[in-house]
């Protein structure tokens, strides 16, 4: 029995002994990539969540809270609407001749003149806003037989009764109001905008006291259009002490065309025209303060940076702005797939390369080498493969911004109650566009992320194959991203492998000799398993033989009696 125990002990020592080649005659070289303890989750085409070492947020979700006055010219409407400034409301006289890129209307704006309405308010507001100017040219209209410059206590200019400065209220002269027929040709080479109106008295008595006739009529024509308006006499809700109203209309006269005005009463006549310009100017409702700063993109919430391709601050924008999307976040991968390092390994406790996990602490590159040789252990980055990956990734964000950032503005849409169907259709179209852009944005980012991860994986594989081609039969692929080098390889040798100057032939004979010696005695884990199973089987067989012999011996001595019955 003692002999068997001794042999078993010797056998176990033989199995557990250090293998030849784990001394200074071999080295280990592993290839790996950068990793971080806590990566960032991004979405790809194939995965909803995949962890990468670094990612950039693509959605701007906050504003500065203020509107920057540079590089866009911002005109603060203060307490005036654009239409009030256009008509010449007394408290808006400061805006005469003003120009702007963006006119900012405030919620506190109010009218302080004769009560009026504009049947096509949204179109007029948008037209004037895009022109970017309130430049007004007075013309010499001749109104014979009527009283001009009518005014009202509801529209005081200083202590006196007044009226809109750009309009001329015509009333009867003595007891007559003749038929007016005035023409005004456009001999210039630009469009002219004429603002005019019609007065709706609250009573028949007011109608005749102002215009003599029981009902007036206003017709304004050009070669391209004609509008005939008849006043609607009747009481309306009281505003600033008045129950009568004025309706404002507008006509554009092209170069070479003629403006014709015909009326027998109730006419609010133009005093001249606004010079129309084509441009990128616009208007926005906002209560954000205007500050001295620089920003290309403006929203009602305030200016926002345009260094991201998407934003979800506001659908209404002006300038070079990111596209509005519904998502609160879209992350673009700007690093590789993250596989955190298994901390229990130590540097070379159980050496492993990129196939098993990444390496934390690689601050000078994305890809690199770790080695273990007779001089110790070390690590170095591979700058060439790192730079190749970075160069291809760096342009991604700029390309996405170029695809989405355009010089455009999304203005507010306004519709009257009778245009409810148009408003519903417009809202549906806008919502559909936003849904489409949101889907496209998510798809675009997922595609770019997939490409980034595939790209960085490819660079790792290229570096591994490059190293394999250098080492050839001088080393063995260990299957985990590492090579077992079968010759003595000091730090200079390791450096030659990293920089591509390794000479395979110099070490060939030594590597073949060491490989032969090691392979001759090396027991792989598979052979150990076979030996253990064979040993177990032999032990069981010997135990059975001993037991059977003991039974036969006792039977011969008569100590055991065995009866076999059939």
Swiss-Prot record:
The chain crosses the membrane at residues 531-551. It is found in: Virion membrane; Host apical cell membrane. InterPro entries: Capsid_hemagglutn, Hemagglutn_HA1_a/b_dom_sf, Hemagglutn_influenz_A, Hemagglutn_influenz_A/B. One of its GO terms (molecular function) is host cell surface receptor binding. It comes from the Viruses. Major glycoprotein, comprises over 80% of the envelope proteins present in virus particle. The extent of infection into host organism is determined by HA. Influenza viruses bud from the apical surface of polarized epithelial cells (e.g. bronchial epithelial cells) into lumen of lungs and are therefore usually pneumotropic. The reason is that HA is cleaved by tryptase clara which is restricted to lungs. However, HAs of H5 and H7 pantropic avian viruses subtypes can be cleaved by furin and subtilisin-type enzymes, allowing the virus to grow in other organs than lungs. HAMAP family: INFV_HEMA (MF_04072). This is Hemagglutinin. It comes from Influenza A virus (strain A/X-31 H3N2). The lineage of its organism: Viruses, Riboviria, Orthornavirae, Negarnaviricota, Polyploviricotina.
